[in-house]
């Protein structure tokens, strides 16, 4: 093979490789652009039919990362100064964007009567033996409203229906606690992850009650959750301790008992704080711990507001412009 021919072959091979790389790069770029267009279409039209489960999971991941790294500011500015202005805004949208009439009931009474007669009779028939027409109509209306809101919430939270996974998880957790049953590993992982706001509320409430009862940090506010027996026992306990020691020394019962034990000769253990044993080995979880409850509540309210906004837009049935 002559040198010029070898050089030509090498150049052709190099050019072919470059074309393949450009083609691959163009395909990847087109794929990214298409995906972005699908996301934009999803937010504009509430249509999830063109999204695969993997795409929905990626959208959820991006949303969670944004919420975790940039939670909603406590000093969030309201778009409307008053509820009246908000109502006027949606009234204007109804006039400008309102399309065809939307049926009030997405479930026809005949469907409820033929498929779910027991549902209408149990919850809407007021104890009567036979199902009445009014009960069927009311059941159809309530089911329609519930499903329409679930659709809006599903789109706002990027979670396809059925939604009640977290609600079932919360109910299971509460039932297990009340029955003093073994907590399954998956439920323990869900609690430890602190990704489920309602689970966090349950555990935070229990810990707040303990803090308030034994340290008075919340000014006895959580006495409301105690029954009469436990409330009387706690009040009596604090009165007895207050009788034995000055108020300033007995406010924190934990510290007061620890001081008494130390005076009696008990030596502090090496791992005195239980939090030391459970402390994470890295600082990765400190971001979640540093988020205030106000920021968490505002973030949750933002998603609820988005669900309500989409619910209202569903009611408008406006003409979509692409």
UniProtKB/Swiss-Prot annotation:
The keyword Glycoprotein applies. Glycans are attached at residues 130, 283, 290. One of its GO terms (molecular function) is structural molecule activity. The keyword Ribonucleoprotein does not apply. It comes from the Viruses. Pfam families: Baculo_gp41. GO terms for cellular component: virion component. Keywords: Glycoprotein, Late protein, Virion. Its main location: virion. InterPro entries: Baculovirus_Gp41 (IPR006790). It is found in: Virion. Belongs to the baculoviridae gp41 family. This is Structural glycoprotein p40. The gene is P40.
């Amino acid at each position: 093979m002559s040198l010029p021919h070898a050089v030509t072959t090498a150049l052709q091979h190099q050019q072919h490789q470059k074309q393949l790389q450009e083609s691959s790069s163009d395909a990847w770029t087109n794929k990214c652009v298409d995906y972005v267009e699908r996301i934009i279409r999803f937010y504009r039209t509430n249509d999830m039919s063109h999204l695969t489960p993997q795409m929905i999971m990626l959208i959820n991941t991006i949303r969670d990362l944004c919420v975790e790294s940039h939670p909603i500011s406590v000093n969030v500015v309201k778009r409307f100064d008053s509820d009246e202005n908000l109502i006027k805004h949606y009234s204007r949208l109804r006039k400008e964007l309102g399309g065809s009439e939307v049926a009030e009931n997405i479930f026809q009474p005949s469907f409820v009567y033929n498929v779910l007669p027991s549902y209408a009779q149990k919850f809407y028939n007021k104890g009567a033996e036979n199902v009445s027409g009014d009960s069927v109509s009311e059941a159809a209306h309530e089911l329609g409203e519930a499903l329409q809101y679930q659709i809006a919430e599903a789109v706002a939270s990027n979670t396809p229906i059925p939604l009640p996974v977290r609600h079932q998880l919360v109910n299971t957790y509460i039932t297990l606690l009340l029955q003093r049953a073994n907590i399954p590993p998956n439920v323990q992982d869900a609690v430890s992850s602190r990704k489920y706001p309602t689970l966090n509320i349950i555990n935070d409430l229990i810990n707040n009650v303990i803090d308030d009862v034994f340290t008075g940090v919340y000014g006895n506010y959580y006495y409301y959750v105690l029954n009469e027996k436990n409330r009387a026992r706690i009040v009596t306990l604090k009165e007895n301790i207050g009788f034995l020691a000055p108020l300033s020394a007995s406010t924190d019962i934990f510290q007061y008992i620890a001081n008494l034990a130390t005076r009696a000769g008990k030596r502090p253990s090496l791992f005195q704080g239980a939090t030391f044993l459970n402390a994470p080995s890295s600082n990765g979880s400190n971001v979640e711990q540093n988020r205030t409850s106000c920021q968490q509540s505002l973030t949750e309210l933002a998603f609820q507001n988005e669900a309500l906004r989409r619910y209202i837009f569903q009611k408008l049935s406006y003409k979509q412009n692409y």
